[in-house]
Amino acid sequence: MSLHKSRYTLKILILFVSFLSSQNAAAHGGVAFEDDLCVINIDFLQAHFTVFQPETRESDEFCEDIPDVARSVFVMEYLHSLLPEMAIDFRIIRDINEVGRYATLDDVLAIDDLEAATVYYEPPRIEPGGFYTASYEFDAEGTYIGVVTADHPTEDRYY
């Protein structure tokens, strides 16, 4: 469950916040693709990241602030043809160092006990259908950092 520290690594950090108050909800709107905050770049790879809370928000889509402490379904739609061949893992950690929305890989690596900060971990898996999904039920409000790691299918590289 370690982040790959010894090799050339690039990780994409997705920050999201879970609040009980719906005043902080930021639903995904119909923005242009190039302005879409839900599009994440993993080096040269792109994916569209969306969070749903079906029990409390029906079909509303979120990509940063998650309004409710409830079950959250994370969907990453692959926008690059290489991603369906890559082993992808997903981790949610508490923002124990309080770095907030601008967390970096260095901030994550600075956590002394990543295992203790991790509230959810989905081991690497290949999703050839073009979508990666995971579900986690938050039990406390707070700031959480999502970390996605992609393993190149033929080269010794991680993204």
What residue spans do the PLM features occupy?
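Bacterial N-terminal signal peptides that target proteins for export
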Residues: 2-12
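N-terminal signal peptide c-region/cleavage motif recognized by signal peptidases
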Residues: 22-24
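Contiguous segments within soluble domain cores/interaction surfaces
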Residues: 28-133, 139-141, 149-159
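Sec-dependent N-terminal signal peptides of Gram-positive bacterial secreted proteins and lipoproteins
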Residues: 12-19
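N-terminal export/targeting leaders of redox proteins
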Residues: 2, 27-28
